[in-house]
């Protein structure tokens, strides 16, 4: 009995190498396929009656290998949020734990942030039962309540200079005009929500702390060494609206932001982030170095333009003998480094010292000053952008940076323990993968 093969056309057929069309490719036609038929194989071709529709789907909304986070929503849609997959079960979490970081990120919190009024109240819809994670996907959602779509009527046709308006059109041929869609900083709500959970797990398991603060606003730069990273606290960072732990420089930064805010302009700045009590051994050699993972995570945030780790670019002015972190043994017999120009990571792997890095944020691109631009029809015009926007993004970027760093660290920690258990198991239902249970994990046995 002869076999039968049916084919479905894809863009007029299958590709084969040729030079007849000048591009190096041509296509099998239906007659070519019929010529392949013989007594044992019969090929029938069904013609496409309706025109093909090419659907473009945006990717890149998911992050992480084990602790995976997918964000969703747009600035002027019904809401924003995230779905977290891979969270360890039986860990205590509440909406209040997440809300505290969302409050640090939300708009309208001070005169130097966007005046948009959103409470950003989160709700957990799945993955948590009786206050504990279940191991299934966790869905966290935040509604949008203060949209003003009419503010973006001019941007429907004109591109904001240095904004994603133009590149979204270049890539997709269509975009969400109101609020910039996915390019809006409201997308980061999902990241901050997931990061709040990640920070709590890191703290419970290893005592790991992630703290970020503003170290530069426009031309006001916090001097190196003025902040003690060994003792820095969240209370110091949150003591003022710009989130600079030094009160004197905080006032200077606020004044610099105010000066451009009243003119409808904007400025950029730098966020410094430190990680204390990071377990040794996180990260991998070559492509998955810990600093590479951190750089990718932080550079995925809106408005980021630079990343510096450890000694950063200033290290290029030193010799090897000046830059090397010499080892010693401390009073507890633990191998440490006397200096930390490596920034807590060597060879792509954490060494147990404080990890430190800096992220540069550009000035907000949507400003209330007249600028030259073009329309979608390529007409050159002048644009004064309306809407409510931050005169400087760095005060609200602080919890965003902390979130992305925490997501990387937890994902790397779980990868490190991929062949064991992150937390103590339920002995009534599970068998241990290892006879050794860390003291930190054992402390959560009652969870």
Curated annotation (Swiss-Prot):
The protein's assembly and partners: Homotetramer.
Pfam families referenced in this protein's UniProt entry, alphabetically: Chorismate_synt (PF01264)
Descriptive protein name: Chorismate synthase, chloroplastic
Cofactor names: FMNH2
Residue ranges, annotated region (Disordered): 1-24
EC number from the UniProt entry: 4.2.3.5
Keyword hit for Amino-acid biosynthesis: yes
Enzyme's top EC category: lyase
Segment annotated as transit peptide: 1-57
Signal peptide: none
Post-translational changes noted in the entry: The N-terminus is blocked.
CDD domains to which the protein is assigned, alphabetical: Chorismate_synthase
Pathway participation: Metabolic intermediate biosynthesis; chorismate biosynthesis; chorismate from D-erythrose 4-phosphate and phosphoenolpyruvate: step 7/7
InterPro entries linked: Chorismate_synth, Chorismate_synth_AroC_sf, Chorismate_synthase_CS
Organism expressing this protein natively: Capnoides sempervirens
GO molecular function: chorismate synthase activity; FMN binding
Chief place of localization: plastid
Family to which the UniProt record says this protein belongs: Belongs to the chorismate synthase family.
Function: Catalyzes the last common step of the biosynthesis of aromatic amino acids, produced via the shikimic acid pathway.
């Amino acid at each position: 009995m002869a076999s039968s093969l049916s084919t479905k056309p894809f863009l007029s057929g299958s590709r084969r190498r040729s030079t007849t069309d000048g591009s190096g490719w041509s296509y099998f036609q239906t007659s070519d396929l019929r010529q392949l038929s013989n007594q044992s194989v019969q090929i029938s071709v069904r013609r496409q009656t309706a025109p093909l529709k090419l659907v473009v789907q945006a990717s890149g909304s998911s992050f992480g290998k084990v602790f995976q986070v997918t964000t969703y929503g747009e600035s002027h849609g019904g809401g924003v949020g995230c779905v977290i997959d891979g969270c360890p079960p039986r860990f205590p979490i509440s909406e209040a734990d997440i809300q505290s970081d969302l409050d640090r990120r939300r708009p309208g919190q001070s005169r130097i942030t966007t005046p948009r009024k959103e409470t950003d109240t989160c709700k957990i819809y799945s993955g948590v039962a009786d206050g504990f994670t279940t191991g299934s996907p966790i869905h966290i959602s935040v509604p949008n309540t203060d949209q003003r779509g009419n503010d973006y009527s001019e941007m429907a046709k004109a591109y904001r200079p240095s904004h994603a308006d133009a590149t979204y059109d270049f890539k997709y041929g269509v975009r969400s005009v109101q609020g910039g869609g996915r390019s809006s900083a409201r997308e980061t709500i999902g990241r901050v929500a997931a990061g709040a959970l990640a920070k709590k797990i890191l703290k419970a398991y290893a005592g790991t702390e992630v703290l970020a603060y503003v170290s530069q606003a426009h031309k006001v730069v916090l001097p190196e060494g003025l902040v003690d990273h060994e003792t820095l606290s969240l209370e110091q960072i949150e003591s003022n609206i710009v989130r600079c732990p030094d009160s004197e420089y905080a006032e200077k930064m606020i004044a610099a932001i105010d000066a451009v805010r009243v003119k409808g302009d904007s400025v950029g700045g730098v966020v410094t982030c430190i990680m204390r009590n990071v377990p040794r051994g996180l990260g991998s050699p070559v492509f998955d170095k810990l600093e590479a993972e951190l750089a990718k995570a932080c550079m995925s945030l809106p408005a980021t333009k630079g990343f510096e780790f450890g000694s950063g670019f200033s290290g290029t002015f030193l010799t090897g003998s000046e830059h090397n972190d010499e080892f010693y043994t401390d009073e507890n017999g633990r191998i440490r480094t006397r200096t930390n120009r490596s920034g807590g990571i060597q060879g792509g792997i954490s060494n147990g010292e404080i990890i430190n890095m800096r992220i540069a944020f550009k000035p907000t691109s949507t400003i209330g000053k007249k600028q030259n631009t073009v329309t979608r029809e390529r007409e050159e015009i002048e644009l004064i952008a309306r809407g409510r926007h931050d005169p400087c993004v760095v005060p609200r970027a602080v919890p965003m940076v902390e979130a992305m760093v925490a997501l990387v660290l937890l994902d790397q920690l779980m990868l490190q323990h991929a062949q064991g258990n992150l937390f103590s198991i339920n002995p009534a239902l599970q068998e241990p993968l290892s006879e050794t249970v860390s003291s930190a994990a054992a402390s959560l046995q009652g969870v």
